[in-house]
């Protein structure tokens, strides 16, 4: 009997995107249900201890939460395996996957309230970005992905933040990656990868821009007007 999967999501959530990338890369069919983040239903809060997405519902009865746990579960139950076979490499991948919350502050740059705040957020993001550049220098391969030619779970973990950062960087350049050629190349490979592109809603760039406009922060002035975008 085929296992049934339902992914509970917000349309712009990077952590859901990570789970969706893994599902797409493994060719797993799944249903997606979007939750109103401003009015989260009781049934959802009952299965999500943090009242957050993603939640993966398996066969209508098992609710898994936290993107890392979901990704690891999917890698255990479906081919192709997205973790390296070598135990040292696998542990290293998991360690750098645990670093994603530090790096994901690049997605918060768009929340700056003014130019000074914007510059401060970019400067703060230099530390995790530089450390990630250093990790890529020591990975022992030429890419394009973290482990070389094969797309892995660690790639799925970083792709959502890098895609959203790139949207921002194109409308209001940050200079964050100017001296980080390996991180730039990795970013370019990830944001062009089919599972990454297919793991979000259609016209996701427009959806992201709409969210930024709704937030009403300083970077809104650099977006094309909604009328022009249409």
Across the structure, where does each feature detected by a protein language model lie?
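Short acidic/histidine-centered micro-motifs embedded in hydrophobic/aromatic stretches
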Residues: 96-99, 110, 159, 202-206
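Long, charge-rich low-complexity segments
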Residues: 197-229
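GST superfamily/GST-like fold recognition
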Residues: 146-172, 179-185, 190
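Short secondary-structure junctions and interdomain/linker hinges
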Residues: 114, 139, 194-197, 211
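A contiguous, mid-protein "functional segment" used to position or interact
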Residues: 174-209
């Amino acid at each position: 009997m085929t296992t049934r999967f339902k992914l509970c999501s917000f349309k712009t959530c990077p952590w859901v995107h990570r789970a969706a990338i893994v599902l797409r890369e493994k060719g797993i069919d799944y249903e997606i249900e979007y939750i109103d983040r401003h009015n989260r239903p009781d049934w959802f809060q009952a299965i999500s201890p943090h009242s957050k997405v993603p939640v993966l519902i398996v066969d209508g009865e098992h609710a898994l939460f936290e993107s890392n746990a979901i990704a690891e579960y999917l890698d255990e139950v479906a081919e192709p395996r997205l973790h390296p076979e070598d135990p040292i490499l696998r542990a290293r991948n998991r360690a750098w996957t645990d670093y994603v919350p530090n790096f994901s502050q690049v997605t918060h740059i768009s929340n700056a309230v003014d130019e000074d705040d914007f510059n401060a957020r970019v400067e703060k993001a230099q530390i995790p970005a530089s450390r990630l550049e250093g990790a890529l220098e020591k990975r022992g391969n030429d890419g394009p992905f973290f482990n070389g030619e094969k797309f892995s779970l660690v790639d799925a973990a970083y792709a959502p933040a890098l895609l959203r950062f790139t949207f921002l960087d194109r409308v209001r350049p940050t200079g964050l990656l100017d001296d980080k050629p390996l991180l730039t190349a990795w970013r370019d490979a990830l944001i062009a990868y089919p599972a990454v592109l297919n793991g979000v809603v259609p016209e996701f760039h427009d959806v992201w821009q709409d969210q930024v406009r709704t937030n009403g922060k300083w970077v809104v002035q650099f977006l094309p007007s909604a009328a022009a975008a249409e």
